Amino acid sequence: MHPFSRLFRNIQSLGEEEVQELLGPPEDALPLLAGEDLNHRVADALNLHLPTADLQWVHKTNAITGLYSNQAAQFNPHWIQPEFPELHLHNELIKKLQQYFGPLTINEKRKLQLNFPARFFPKATKYFPLIKGIKNNYPNFALEHFFATANYLWTLWEAGILYLRKNQTTLTFKGKPYSWEHRQLVQHNGQQHKSHLQSRQNSSVVACSGHLLHNHLPSEPVSVSTRNLSNNIFGKSQNSTRTGLCSHKQIQTDRLEHLARISCRSKTTIGQQGSSPKISSNFRNQTWAYNSSWNSGHTTWFSSASNSNKSRSREKAYSSNSTSKRYSPPLNYEKSDFSSPGVRGRIKRLDNNGTPTQCLWRSFYDTKPCGSYCIHHIVSSIDDWGPCTVTGDVTIKSPRTPRRITGGVFLVDKNPNNSSESRLVVDFSQFSRGHTRVHWPKFAVPNLQTLANLLSTDLQWLSLDVSAAFYHIPISPAAVPHLLVGSPGLERFNTCLSYSTHNRNDSQLQTMHNLCTRHVYSSLLLLFKTYGRKLHLLAHPFIMGFRKLPMGVGLSPFLLAQFTSALASMVRRNFPHCVVFAYMDDLVLGARTSEHLTAIYTHICSVFLDLGIHLNVNKTKWWGNHLHFMGYVITSSGVLPQDKHVKKLSRYLRSVPVNQPLDYKICERLTDILNYVAPFTLCGYAALMPLYHAIASRTAFVFSSLYKSWLLSLYEELWPVVRQRGVVCSVFADATPTGWGIATTCQLLSGTFAFPLPIATAELIAACLARCWTGARLLGTDNSVVLSGKLTSFPWLLACVANWILRGTSFCYVPSALNPADLPSRGLLPVLRPLPRLRFRPPTSRISLWAASPPVSPRRPVRVAWSSPVQNCEPWIPP
């Protein structure tokens, strides 16, 4: 049935004779459909012209939103965070693959070397402050989203997917180190690496004296008077520390020895002796610097000891009064219980600059509750909140990593059909725009015709899903400074609190109570039920870098496609009688019998598990002869969209209002849905050309009742996209602005147009006539526009009818000099000659879905327990 038969009869401006002529023979109707006057008259009847600007646009139609009506993201307080297995590829992946699959090809090695490890070194990187680490996409659930996102990041760190930044040059992580990480190894399983330990022993005494003195100190306590220490090292007078008989080097060495003995001595002794508030703050800074660094496994004596020269140069600039105003812990801190550090008291820790900072969470211990909703009630309910930070199994050296981030993070639903689980979104969009833009490598994506050519066969199908596929591919540690994420800590919710203020006294604690509101208090109580003591760890700021491939970088899809395609190629070579197809994290297996498919699946699962590749068993599906893949149903008869997409499209299209101007954003979102099913309709994409014109013009579009009903009738009747076959071309078509010609193996045909036409339009009409009169599914032509198959550049009515006529037709290029239809198109009928032998090969869009393999040797041992379905030594190759 003609696609315009019902539409033309409903247009009153078209007479009955004109309708019969338009629906008549194609040689008469097609030139008329290309006429500009007819297209304008039909557009007027369907009200397809752009509306005037004085009409008010509609910005929302049921489920489709347009301009100024963006839907707010929905936060789920009961999101389930996924659990990640130990994702660690084998250290010798290429050698291990060669043991299983034999020698690898050059392309397979190249693809694997790109991913092991992956490298990402942009020319420019923009760094953002840590306060932008977690995006506030849910203002009504800011605190809940903050802790949920921080917990997600710590979950990734525990799975070995993220590095934790300890300082500018040190990273720590959990899991097994890769071979390239062994070169930068500092600490592994609590033990110093040999190379790092040797370099530390060869360094200066200042850099490592604290660690060495601690190892060589006697076990019995040594009584050292605090008074003597303060008089001998620092002194109550500034001049006494500067004008001694001993040299500066001796003073520095004595200072280090005394401080090391104090840190190794019983803390109860120091607590009993106490300390005066008038003691120089420099002594307390160095003591706390050593204790904090010793707990974290590092020494920071060098930074504190090297400042003696700076303090000596500032002796004349600062008086004794100004010196006493330097940073010193408050009185409550000095009177805290030293016998149980890390449990109560305003515990100090070092930031990355070596400056002691206080734990915001534990600081509520020493403050009086400001009201009934004070956080003091929550903090004081537990004595031991655990450590402020953690250290992984492995510590490595890294390039200079600033205390900044390169992208924010937030949580969303895992997918539109699963709102119970959360997914982490990393915003590394700076590498896709601006001066920091990176031009990502391109890779081929299978189109609809490619899927039909390669997968539309009568096989048994099985689809596999790689669990957390992006997180399988490791990244070089040198790329960490470009892929930084983090959390600003609770200070994000109290902007008045500043850790860099010079007036550090108890008045600062009053600003902390700005957090004490009813909403924060009730939210923390609910979060405590979820996270327990981990709430304290999540409240601290931290910076992490990606150790595995993140999903927010444009390089990730390219690398993942290379990785999975290399695996599919190796499996295909070893199982030449099956079909293996990989796209991103989806792997498809096809075999002639279900028993053979089961054997291949068992072997692949065991091999992948040994290589460290985890498959999601819950998403493994056996499809039989109907493969569901990428939203399509692929069978031996062709490809059709899944029912859920058809129902969604019909629901959205029926909800579109009639005779109301819809803004172009609604048209964009509607065409996104219609384009998915358009290749299966009679008129294809050409039916949506009026919508494309409105979107390109950035103006509104009005659906008439005739146009809407016509679209509904088109999308109710779907036709499969069938597989193309490799045959020899036997029909050729050519045209001139005034005539057309067709050449077959047995005859030559020619004709003329009633009026001159553009050459591309004439070539398209000639191809349509050749298809109608010969029924050939393969045509030879010399016009590149017709070869492309993109008909949206032609007049609207002609494009729709041509798409209907040429549906399922393939084209092959023939030069004009060799085209046998060239002379008939010019009105000449020469003697019939043999046609050029042109063989058509179905295109695969540069997708290597299968690898050519040698024939199966008859002496090769069988891979399955029963007889192989291969009846001969020839490998089965997709058509």
Swiss-Prot record:
Site-annotated residues for Priming of reverse-transcription by covalently linking the first nucleotide of the (-)DNA: Y68
GO BP annotations, alphabetical order: DNA replication; symbiont-mediated suppression of host innate immune response
One Gene Ontology molecular-function label: RNA-DNA hybrid ribonuclease activity
Residue stretches making up the Reverse transcriptase domain: 393-634
Terminal protein domain (TP): annotated segments: 1-184
SUPFAM superfamilies given in the database record: DNA/RNA polymerases
Superkingdom: Viruses
Region annotation Disordered: where it falls in the sequence: 304-345
Region (Polymerase/reverse transcriptase domain (RT)): 383-724
Alphabetical list of InterPro entries matching this protein: DNA/RNA_pol_sf, DNApol_viral_C, DNApol_viral_N, HBV_DPOL, Hepadnavirus_pol/RT, Rev_trsase/Diguanyl_cyclase, RT_dom
Nuclease found in the keyword field: yes
Regulation acting on activity, per entry: Activated by host HSP70 and HSP40 in vitro to be able to bind the epsilon loop of the pgRNA. Because deletion of the RNase H region renders the protein partly chaperone-independent, the chaperones may be needed indirectly to relieve occlusion of the RNA-binding site by this domain. Inhibited by several reverse-transcriptase inhibitors: Lamivudine, Adefovir and Entecavir.
Region (Spacer): 185-382
Catalytic activity entry: DNA(n) + a 2'-deoxyribonucleoside 5'-triphosphate = DNA(n+1) + diphosphate; Endonucleolytic cleavage to 5'-phosphomonoester
Enzyme Commission number, as recorded: 2.7.7.7, 2.7.7.49, 3.1.26.4
Pfam family, one: DNA_pol_viral_C
Keywords per UniProt: DNA replication, DNA-binding, DNA-directed DNA polymerase, Endonuclease, Host-virus interaction, Hydrolase, Inhibition of host innate immune response by virus, Inhibition of host RLR pathway by virus, Magnesium, Metal-binding, Multifunctional enzyme, Nuclease, Nucleotidyltransferase, RNA-directed DNA polymerase, Transferase, Viral immunoevasion
Amino-acid positions noted as binding Mg(2+) in the UniProt annotation, renumbered to this chain: D465, D585, D586
Annotated family: Belongs to the hepadnaviridae P protein family.
UniProt-listed PANTHER family: REVERSE TRANSCRIPTASE DOMAIN-CONTAINING PROTEIN (PTHR33050), RIBONUCLEASE H (PTHR33050:SF7)
HAMAP family membership: HBV_DPOL
Further remark: Hepadnaviral virions contain probably just one P protein molecule per particle.
Function: Multifunctional enzyme that converts the viral RNA genome into dsDNA in viral cytoplasmic capsids. This enzyme displays a DNA polymerase activity that can copy either DNA or RNA templates, and a ribonuclease H (RNase H) activity that cleaves the RNA strand of RNA-DNA heteroduplexes in a partially processive 3'- to 5'-endonucleasic mode. Neo-synthesized pregenomic RNA (pgRNA) are encapsidated together with the P protein, and reverse-transcribed inside the nucleocapsid.
Record note on domains: Terminal protein domain (TP) is hepadnavirus-specific. Spacer domain is highly variable and separates the TP and RT domains. Polymerase/reverse-transcriptase domain (RT) and ribonuclease H domain (RH) are similar to retrovirus reverse transcriptase/RNase H. The polymerase/reverse transcriptase (RT) and ribonuclease H (RH) domains are structured in five subdomains: finger, palm, thumb, connection and RNase H. Within the palm subdomain, the 'primer grip' region is thought to be involved in the positioning of the primer terminus for accommodating the incoming nucleotide. The RH domain stabilizes the association of RT with primer-template.
Protein name: Protein P
Upper lineage: Viruses, Riboviria, Pararnavirae, Artverviricota, Revtraviricetes
